């Protein structure tokens, strides 16, 4: 049975997220806290789209974060896990750096531990303790944007991990420690 994120949990996190805006990572402190932030995400596996402002008037918006969490769920199991709002901030910054409002195409968002273990057995390119399993990572691309430019933008903002997978045609972005790697 799929794990669902309860709205009450999102509201609790929303209160904490307001505090986290004060203690934002260095790269995110360049944002004007009163300016709205938006994300446009297309889940390639489910056909669902998230297009909304997720942050406005100095606060993350719990309903928007809940919808983004749903769109980024593990499409294999239906499980959901709250997605780190600073991941959306990273995507917002990447889109701004690329001067693009095109949707980020989701290859992989949240992965349940079960899905991650299965993928780890099939491929040495899947980390056993992946940031995907804690809602802090996304594998993506943007139609019409060179993958190398997407990687450069993700690296330039310094948000966390950036993996470049040119053969598989995606870039991994996470909000863990800053690091870079190249996969296949």
Predicted stretch roles:
Residues 22-52:
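C-terminal segment of N-terminal export signals and the immediately downstream linker at the start
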Residues 1-4, 9-28:
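N-terminal export signals
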Residues 113-128:
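Charged, often glycine-rich, active-site loop that binds/positions anionic groups
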Residues 43-45, 54-56, 108-110, 142-144, ...:
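A mature extracytoplasmic/lumenal domain signature
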Residues 103-117:
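Acidic helix-start/capping segments at beta-turn-to-alpha-helix junctions
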Residues 88-92, 116, 147, 151:
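Extracytoplasmic/secreted envelope proteins and their assembly/folding machinery
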Residues 4, 37-42, 125-184:
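Catalytic cores and adjacent binding grooves of peptidoglycan-active enzymes
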Residues 57-107:
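Active-site acidic/histidine clusters and adjacent loop/turn architecture
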């Amino acid at each position: 049975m799929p794990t669902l994120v309860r709205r009450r949990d999102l509201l609790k996190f929303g209160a904490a997220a307001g505090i986290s805006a004060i203690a934002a990572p260095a790269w995110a402190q360049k944002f004007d806290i009163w300016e709205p932030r938006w994300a446009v995400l297309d889940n390639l596996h489910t056909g669902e789209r998230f297009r909304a402002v997720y942050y406005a008037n100095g606060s993350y918006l719990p309903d928007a974060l809940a919808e983004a969490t749903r769109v980024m769920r593990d499409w294999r199991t239906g499980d959901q896990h709250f997605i780190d709002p600073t991941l959306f901030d990273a995507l917002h910054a990447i889109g701004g750096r690329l001067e693009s409002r095109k949707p980020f195409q989701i290859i992989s968002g949240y992965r349940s531990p079960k899905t991650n273990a299965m993928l780890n057995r099939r491929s040495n390119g899947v980390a056993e303790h992946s940031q995907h399993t804690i809602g802090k990572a996304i594998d993506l691309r943007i139609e019409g944007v060179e993958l190398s430019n997407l990687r450069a933008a993700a690296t330039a903002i310094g948000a966390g991990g950036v993996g470049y997978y040119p053969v598989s045609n995606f870039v991994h972005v996470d909000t863990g420690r800053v690091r870079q790697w190249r996969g296949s």
